[in-house]
Amino acid sequence: MRQSGRKSNQLRPISLELSPLINAEGSCLIKIGNTHVMCSATCETTVPPFLRGQNQGWITAEYGMIPGSTSHRIKREAALGKQGGRTQEIQRLIGRAMRCVINLQKLGERQIIIDCDVINADGGTRTAAITGSYVALHLAIRSLMKKRILKVNPLISQIAAISCGIYKGNAVLDLDYLEDSDAEVDSNFVFACNGNLIEVQGTAEKEPFSEEQFLAMLKLAKSGVVELFKLQNQVLIAAE
Protein backbone atom coordinates (compact mmCIF):
# COMPACT_ATOMS: atom_id res chain seq x y z
CA MET A 1 0.00 0.00 0.00
CA ARG A 2 1.28 3.46 -0.90
CA GLN A 3 1.46 5.93 1.99
CA SER A 4 -0.77 8.31 0.05
CA GLY A 5 -3.43 5.63 -0.37
CA ARG A 6 -3.17 5.85 -4.16
CA LYS A 7 -3.40 2.79 -6.38
CA SER A 8 -0.24 1.74 -8.19
CA ASN A 9 -1.52 3.22 -11.48
CA GLN A 10 -2.98 6.40 -10.00
CA LEU A 11 -1.64 9.89 -10.69
CA ARG A 12 -1.72 12.62 -8.10
CA PRO A 13 -4.30 15.40 -8.67
CA ILE A 14 -3.17 17.55 -11.61
CA SER A 15 -3.99 21.07 -12.72
CA LEU A 16 -2.68 23.30 -15.51
CA GLU A 17 -3.14 27.06 -15.11
CA LEU A 18 -2.59 28.85 -18.40
CA SER A 19 -0.88 32.22 -18.84
CA PRO A 20 -0.18 33.16 -15.20
CA LEU A 21 2.72 35.33 -16.46
CA ILE A 22 1.59 38.29 -18.54
CA ASN A 23 4.93 39.10 -20.19
CA ALA A 24 6.01 35.73 -21.57
CA GLU A 25 4.64 34.58 -24.93
CA GLY A 26 3.44 31.43 -23.19
CA SER A 27 3.29 30.25 -19.58
CA CYS A 28 1.77 27.49 -17.49
CA LEU A 29 1.68 26.73 -13.79
CA ILE A 30 1.52 22.96 -13.44
CA LYS A 31 0.54 21.33 -10.17
CA ILE A 32 0.92 17.58 -9.67
CA GLY A 33 0.06 16.90 -6.08
CA ASN A 34 2.36 19.10 -4.03
CA THR A 35 4.85 19.56 -6.87
CA HIS A 36 4.28 22.97 -8.45
CA VAL A 37 6.36 24.26 -11.37
CA MET A 38 6.06 27.59 -13.19
CA CYS A 39 6.91 27.11 -16.86
CA SER A 40 7.31 29.91 -19.39
CA ALA A 41 8.32 30.24 -23.04
CA THR A 42 9.92 33.47 -24.26
CA CYS A 43 10.88 34.23 -27.85
CA GLU A 44 14.09 36.02 -28.83
CA THR A 45 15.15 37.15 -32.30
CA THR A 46 18.67 35.81 -31.85
CA VAL A 47 20.00 32.27 -32.13
CA PRO A 48 23.16 30.60 -30.81
CA PRO A 49 26.31 31.47 -32.82
CA PHE A 50 26.46 28.03 -34.47
CA LEU A 51 23.04 28.66 -36.08
CA ARG A 52 23.52 32.20 -37.36
CA GLY A 53 22.67 32.51 -41.03
CA GLN A 54 21.20 28.99 -41.15
CA ASN A 55 17.53 30.13 -41.19
CA GLN A 56 16.86 27.73 -38.37
CA GLY A 57 15.56 28.26 -34.87
CA TRP A 58 16.47 26.78 -31.52
CA ILE A 59 14.86 25.86 -28.23
CA THR A 60 16.79 25.84 -24.99
CA ALA A 61 15.73 25.51 -21.37
CA GLU A 62 16.66 26.71 -17.92
CA TYR A 63 15.58 25.02 -14.68
CA GLY A 64 15.82 26.05 -11.07
CA MET A 65 14.30 25.58 -7.64
CA ILE A 66 13.37 28.55 -5.50
CA PRO A 67 14.92 28.55 -2.00
CA GLY A 68 11.71 27.64 -0.17
CA SER A 69 10.62 24.86 -2.52
CA THR A 70 11.89 22.07 -0.23
CA SER A 71 11.83 21.35 3.50
CA HIS A 72 15.31 22.87 3.88
CA ARG A 73 16.15 26.15 2.18
CA ILE A 74 18.07 25.72 -1.06
CA LYS A 75 20.81 28.25 -1.72
CA ARG A 76 20.33 30.17 -4.95
CA GLU A 77 22.77 28.89 -7.53
CA ALA A 78 23.34 32.46 -8.69
CA ALA A 79 24.64 33.26 -5.19
CA LEU A 80 26.92 30.22 -5.33
CA GLY A 81 28.29 31.35 -8.68
CA LYS A 82 27.65 28.12 -10.57
CA GLN A 83 24.95 25.67 -11.52
CA GLY A 84 24.89 22.22 -10.00
CA GLY A 85 25.18 19.07 -12.07
CA ARG A 86 21.55 18.12 -11.42
CA THR A 87 20.33 21.49 -12.67
CA GLN A 88 22.36 21.22 -15.86
CA GLU A 89 21.17 17.66 -16.48
CA ILE A 90 17.50 18.57 -16.07
CA GLN A 91 17.53 21.70 -18.20
CA ARG A 92 19.31 19.82 -20.99
CA LEU A 93 16.65 17.12 -20.75
CA ILE A 94 13.87 19.71 -21.05
CA GLY A 95 15.54 21.41 -24.01
CA ARG A 96 16.12 18.10 -25.85
CA ALA A 97 12.53 17.06 -25.26
CA MET A 98 11.08 20.32 -26.61
CA ARG A 99 13.29 20.23 -29.71
CA CYS A 100 11.92 16.77 -30.53
CA VAL A 101 8.42 18.10 -31.09
CA ILE A 102 9.12 21.18 -33.22
CA ASN A 103 10.36 21.78 -36.75
CA LEU A 104 13.29 24.11 -36.14
CA GLN A 105 13.41 25.19 -39.79
CA LYS A 106 9.79 26.35 -39.65
CA LEU A 107 10.59 28.25 -36.46
CA GLY A 108 12.89 30.50 -38.48
CA GLU A 109 15.94 32.28 -37.13
CA ARG A 110 14.67 32.82 -33.60
CA GLN A 111 15.10 31.15 -30.24
CA ILE A 112 12.50 30.11 -27.69
CA ILE A 113 13.75 29.90 -24.13
CA ILE A 114 11.88 27.63 -21.75
CA ASP A 115 12.16 28.62 -18.08
CA CYS A 116 11.08 26.19 -15.37
CA ASP A 117 11.01 27.36 -11.76
CA VAL A 118 10.08 24.84 -9.11
CA ILE A 119 7.89 26.58 -6.53
CA ASN A 120 7.20 23.50 -4.43
CA ALA A 121 8.98 20.15 -4.74
CA ASP A 122 7.41 16.82 -3.79
CA GLY A 123 8.90 14.46 -6.36
CA GLY A 124 8.69 14.43 -10.15
CA THR A 125 9.80 18.01 -10.74
CA ARG A 126 11.56 17.29 -14.03
CA THR A 127 8.63 15.38 -15.51
CA ALA A 128 6.19 18.06 -14.35
CA ALA A 129 8.46 20.67 -15.93
CA ILE A 130 8.36 18.89 -19.28
CA THR A 131 4.58 18.47 -19.24
CA GLY A 132 4.03 22.11 -18.27
CA SER A 133 6.69 23.39 -20.68
CA TYR A 134 4.90 21.85 -23.65
CA VAL A 135 1.79 23.84 -22.75
CA ALA A 136 3.84 27.03 -22.42
CA LEU A 137 5.55 26.32 -25.76
CA HIS A 138 2.22 25.66 -27.46
CA LEU A 139 0.85 28.97 -26.16
CA ALA A 140 3.99 30.80 -27.31
CA ILE A 141 3.67 29.37 -30.83
CA ARG A 142 -0.02 30.30 -30.86
CA SER A 143 0.89 33.87 -29.86
CA LEU A 144 3.57 34.14 -32.57
CA MET A 145 1.12 32.92 -35.20
CA LYS A 146 -1.58 35.38 -34.09
CA LYS A 147 0.96 38.18 -34.44
CA ARG A 148 1.86 36.78 -37.90
CA ILE A 149 5.47 36.41 -36.82
CA LEU A 150 5.08 32.75 -37.78
CA LYS A 151 3.02 31.78 -40.82
CA VAL A 152 3.22 28.01 -40.35
CA ASN A 153 2.83 26.11 -37.09
CA PRO A 154 6.21 24.45 -36.39
CA LEU A 155 4.85 22.07 -33.74
CA ILE A 156 4.87 18.51 -35.02
CA SER A 157 3.83 16.58 -31.93
CA GLN A 158 2.74 16.79 -28.32
CA ILE A 159 4.88 15.83 -25.35
CA ALA A 160 4.36 14.80 -21.73
CA ALA A 161 6.43 13.04 -19.09
CA ILE A 162 5.85 11.04 -15.94
CA SER A 163 7.88 9.19 -13.32
CA CYS A 164 7.56 5.53 -12.38
CA GLY A 165 9.39 3.38 -9.92
CA ILE A 166 9.65 0.12 -8.06
CA TYR A 167 8.45 0.82 -4.53
CA LYS A 168 8.29 -1.97 -1.96
CA GLY A 169 8.64 -4.47 -4.80
CA ASN A 170 5.82 -3.08 -6.91
CA ALA A 171 5.75 -0.87 -9.99
CA VAL A 172 4.05 2.44 -9.14
CA LEU A 173 3.18 5.55 -11.13
CA ASP A 174 4.02 9.17 -10.31
CA LEU A 175 6.18 8.89 -7.19
CA ASP A 176 6.02 11.59 -4.55
CA TYR A 177 9.10 12.55 -2.54
CA LEU A 178 8.62 9.98 0.23
CA GLU A 179 8.22 7.18 -2.30
CA ASP A 180 11.07 8.43 -4.46
CA SER A 181 13.49 8.60 -1.53
CA ASP A 182 12.75 4.99 -0.58
CA ALA A 183 12.24 3.44 -4.03
CA GLU A 184 14.26 0.49 -5.26
CA VAL A 185 14.11 1.90 -8.80
CA ASP A 186 13.44 5.43 -9.99
CA SER A 187 12.66 6.15 -13.65
CA ASN A 188 11.34 8.93 -15.88
CA PHE A 189 9.58 8.49 -19.21
CA VAL A 190 9.11 11.20 -21.85
CA PHE A 191 6.56 10.42 -24.56
CA ALA A 192 5.33 11.91 -27.82
CA CYS A 193 1.56 11.74 -28.25
CA ASN A 194 1.81 8.85 -30.75
CA GLY A 195 3.20 6.68 -27.96
CA ASN A 196 6.80 6.82 -29.13
CA LEU A 197 9.45 7.42 -26.50
CA ILE A 198 11.57 10.57 -26.50
CA GLU A 199 13.69 9.79 -23.46
CA VAL A 200 13.93 7.18 -20.71
CA GLN A 201 15.90 7.57 -17.50
CA GLY A 202 16.12 4.67 -15.08
CA THR A 203 18.25 4.05 -12.02
CA ALA A 204 18.48 1.12 -9.64
CA GLU A 205 18.93 2.51 -6.15
CA LYS A 206 19.56 -0.74 -4.28
CA GLU A 207 19.94 -3.66 -6.68
CA PRO A 208 19.58 -4.30 -10.43
CA PHE A 209 16.05 -4.47 -11.79
CA SER A 210 14.69 -6.95 -14.30
CA GLU A 211 13.33 -6.53 -17.81
CA GLU A 212 9.95 -7.58 -16.43
CA GLN A 213 10.05 -4.74 -13.89
CA PHE A 214 11.09 -2.26 -16.57
CA LEU A 215 8.20 -3.30 -18.81
CA ALA A 216 5.80 -2.98 -15.88
CA MET A 217 6.98 0.60 -15.33
CA LEU A 218 6.75 1.34 -19.05
CA LYS A 219 3.15 0.10 -19.12
CA LEU A 220 2.21 2.32 -16.18
CA ALA A 221 3.96 5.32 -17.72
CA LYS A 222 2.10 4.90 -21.03
CA SER A 223 -1.23 4.83 -19.22
CA GLY A 224 -0.29 7.88 -17.15
CA VAL A 225 0.77 10.11 -20.03
CA VAL A 226 -2.52 9.41 -21.83
CA GLU A 227 -4.22 11.27 -18.98
CA LEU A 228 -1.67 14.08 -19.21
CA PHE A 229 -2.20 14.45 -22.96
CA LYS A 230 -5.96 14.64 -22.44
CA LEU A 231 -5.60 17.38 -19.82
CA GLN A 232 -3.17 19.36 -21.99
CA ASN A 233 -5.61 19.22 -24.89
CA GLN A 234 -8.58 20.17 -22.73
CA VAL A 235 -6.99 23.34 -21.36
CA LEU A 236 -5.44 24.39 -24.67
CA ILE A 237 -8.70 23.95 -26.59
CA ALA A 238 -10.61 25.84 -23.88
CA ALA A 239 -8.16 28.75 -24.21
CA GLU A 240 -8.49 29.12 -27.99
Curated annotation (Swiss-Prot):
It catalyses: tRNA(n+1) + phosphate = tRNA(n) + a ribonucleoside 5'-diphosphate. One of its GO terms (molecular function) is tRNA binding. Keywords: Nucleotidyltransferase, RNA-binding, rRNA processing, Transferase, tRNA processing, tRNA-binding. PROSITE patterns: RIBONUCLEASE_PH. It is an enzyme of class 2 (transferase). Its EC number is 2.7.7.56. Belongs to the RNase PH family. Phosphorolytic 3'-5' exoribonuclease that plays an important role in tRNA 3'-end maturation. Removes nucleotide residues following the 3'-CCA terminus of tRNAs; can also add nucleotides to the ends of RNA molecules by using nucleoside diphosphates as substrates, but this may not be physiologically important. Probably plays a role in initiation of 16S rRNA degradation (leading to ribosome degradation) during starvation. PANTHER family: EXOSOME COMPLEX COMPONENT, EXOSOME COMPLEX COMPONENT RRP41. Homohexameric ring arranged as a trimer of dimers. This is Ribonuclease PH. It comes from Rickettsia prowazekii (strain Madrid E). The lineage of its organism: Bacteria, Pseudomonadati, Pseudomonadota, Alphaproteobacteria, Rickettsiales. The gene is rph.
